[in-house]
UniProtKB/Swiss-Prot annotation:
Compositional bias segments (type: Basic and acidic residues): 9-22
UniProt keywords, alphabetically: Coiled coil, Membrane, Transmembrane, Transmembrane helix
Membrane disposition: Single-pass membrane protein
Species of origin: Mus musculus (Mouse)
UniProt keyword annotation of Transmembrane helix present: yes
Span list, region Disordered: 1-23
Compartments where found: Membrane
Keyword Glycosyltransferase appears in the UniProt entry: no
TM segment ranges: 32-52
High-level lineage: Eukaryota, Metazoa, Chordata, Craniata, Vertebrata
Protein name per UniProt: Single-pass membrane and coiled-coil domain-containing protein 4
Matches recorded under InterPro entries: DUF4519 (IPR027960)
One Pfam family per UniProt: DUF4519
Coiled-coil intervals: 9-31
């Protein structure tokens, strides 16, 4: 049967499995890419603030 333009296609079990797989890969990518990157950025900010605000050593 021909699919009409305006109606969305009904999701099959195969489509549902593919969507779940994509969501799981996205979650895994968050833990392997986003969190370490965020940690590095926070660490750089902390180091910058520490260096900028430490008292000058006068001898």
């Amino acid at each position: 049967m021909r699919q009409l333009k305006g109606k969305p296609k009904k999701e099959t079990s195969k489509d549902k499995k593919e969507r779940k797989q994509a969501m799981q890969e996205a979650r895994q990518q968050i833990t392997t890419v986003v969190l370490p990157t965020l940690a590095v950025v926070v660490l750089l900010i902390v180091v910058f603030v520490y260096v900028a605000t430490r008292p000058a050593v006068t001898e």
